[in-house]
Amino acid sequence: MSADGLDYTNLLPIANVARIMKSALPENAKISKEAKDCVQDCVSEFISFVTGEASEQCTQEKRKTITGEDVLLALNTLGFENYAEVLKISLTKYREQQARSASMKETKQSRSEEPQ
């Protein structure tokens, strides 16, 4: 805990926050340090809030690993249904991409093992 009462170990890196903020704004827009700090605090707290809820679900089910479904359930439980819908689409696309990558890797590996 710092002198100002904040735990900086649980904050997202300010450079990452600023980069995401800039990507959502017009090219010539400026962002104050105060705005970056405020968003950094908010998104870090939001992640902790959702993760805590997802962790409770895991604990109830005697599991140790939080899954994408746990995060979706946490978002719905906490009243963030709109975010859950968008995240579900992203999670599906991510899993499809992972499956394609695994399939391509498997195909490449089996071809390299074939006798020539």
UniProtKB/Swiss-Prot annotation:
Spans annotated as Subunit association domain (SAD): 39-50
SUPFAM superfamilies reported for this sequence: Histone-fold
Compartmental location: Nucleus
DNA-binding region(s) from the entry: 12-18
Chief location of this protein within or outside the cell: nucleus
Stored CDD domains: HFD_NFYB
Any GO BP: positive regulation of transcription by RNA polymerase II
Name the record gives this protein: Transcriptional activator hap3
